[in-house]
Amino acid sequence: MSSPDRSIDIDLEKYPSTATKSVYGQSKDDKNVFDIHPTESEVIPGEVEYADTPSHQNFLQKFFSDFKPVKADREDGVALKRHLKGRHMQMIAIGGAIGTGLFVGSGSSLADGGPASVIIDYTLIGIMMFFTVYALGELAVSYPVAGGFYNYAVRFIDPAWGFAVGWNYFMNYFVTFPLELTTCAITFRYWTDINSCAWITIFLVFVICINLFGVRGYGEVEFILSTLKVVATTGFIILAIIINCGGVPTDPRGYIGGKIIKNKPFRHSFKGFCSVFTTAGFSFSGTEVVGLAAAEAEDPQKSLPRATKQVFWRIAIFYVVSLILIGLLVSPDDPRLMGNSSDGSTSPFVLAIKEANIRGLPSVFNAVIIISTVSVANSCTFTASRTLHAMAAKGDAPRFFAYTDRLGRPLLAMAVCLLFGFFAYINAAGDVSDTVFDWLLAISGISNFFSWGSINLCHIVFRLAMKKQGRSLDQLGFVSPMGIWGSAIGLAFNILCLMAEFYVSLFPIGSKPNANDFFQGYLAAPIVIAFFIGYKIYDRSHIPSLSKLDLDTGLRTYPPKDKESEKIRDAKGFFKWIWQSLC
């Protein structure tokens, strides 16, 4: 066997298993890969293991055999498979979170805050996410463990806080799944009045089928759907520029320029400005999934830094540029916007095309919205099931949810998430469904800010502990070029967003302070606090000191020649540093 190119900090005396060519981030045929594969009783916590599957079976035998538990049932329950390739990670990063928050939710933001508020707030949230994803990228490359930032919060902040944000993160995507299925059905009203339950059934079955193929199915579907979303959004940007410049013969408005945005840049004064933060946060929901997917990536050390850098371009192009153009083309007073109408089949993107009197294209983009919604629904089941699986493996959720079958599927965690999708059928209950979905949406409303703030705080504590213990950043596979200050800025932004939403929830637009509006806007906060205090009372956990913080378990180190971060650190000149950081 050739000498290893990577150094893995595992004590061979403690883990005397044989060294084999194996799976950490590469195919088994890669002679440059060296892996220490421990025995079943000597499992290294946080590592992802390949499950053995029987050979010489026919299709039906293999199908049913795949549902059996993995051969090695580990304490942390991590038996997921590394099947996400680099191209999957790239598209999850670029287009994974582009969905109803951008295409539909931006309509209510435009109606509530006006185009200037939308552009400013989405840009601020984009900057915050830029810092957050880089911090997550550094942590995920160093610790590519199942559960992502939930495990980081348990380790670096406090077990009680990890428990609270873990359940908060799970419930966010758990309740969003039926909401996305309902949005799919409602969007079809643009063409037909067929009962929404029919469309819910079709898309629910589709998502269930995707999950039967495990993480490989998720990766392939997300790759295809994200590609379609990216192409469609790029096409819209080009078309919107042509419309604004008066290049569409069917548009009687001619050259538009900045007429619309100058007329009413802001709506509802400061309250309107603050109200957009929640919708913007929902629009960026899922950006952090690329870190969660690290546990199932073939080579997180190579694919994660590249995927992390793509987030900047997604924010800059697909969010900021497209919303600037929406502000130039769609009036915030348009009664068809989501904020002013119960008709969920329209979005500002569709309205911008319809106002130019272009036939056919509004239907095409409405189809893109449906594709985006299916993509988000697919991501919801992936994210919720993996988070529940990780919590169960650590004892923060019922243990049976840690069950993993031979294909690496967290079967029971996945099943409970998919079963909750049937809750979408309550849409047939009329007005009752609106009330139910309002409260479900309230659970996920501001939960993202707790998750993203925790990621930044984990990175800050991680860096401080590294410094306190005299560790060098040279051993890390990827180093965030924004450093600890980038995470501090990201954390501050999250706190400001929580404060802004508290203000709007307490003093809602167009009405007096009332308990109903407050809890529909801020319900996630008391839920997180209740989980945190409850765990503290039960377990009496404590915040670990920086000098005693465990930095070794699950840590992956790499020689300098194999590190993506070396390119950034060695870059000469400011502009080259910028290029290496973003490309």
UniProtKB/Swiss-Prot annotation:
GO terms for cellular component: cell tip; Golgi membrane; membrane; plasma membrane. GO terms for biological process: amino acid transmembrane transport; nitrogen utilization; proline import across plasma membrane. GO terms for molecular function: amino acid transmembrane transporter activity; L-proline transmembrane transporter activity. The modification Phosphoserine is found at S22. The keyword Membrane applies. It is found in: Golgi apparatus membrane; Membrane. The chain crosses the membrane at residues 91-111, 116-136, 159-179, 194-214, 223-243, 311-331, 364-384, 410-430, 435-455, 476-496, 518-538. Keywords: Amino-acid transport, Glycoprotein, Golgi apparatus, Membrane, Phosphoprotein, Transmembrane, Transmembrane helix, Transport. This is Uncharacterized amino-acid permease P7G5.06. It comes from Schizosaccharomyces pombe (strain 972 / ATCC 24843).
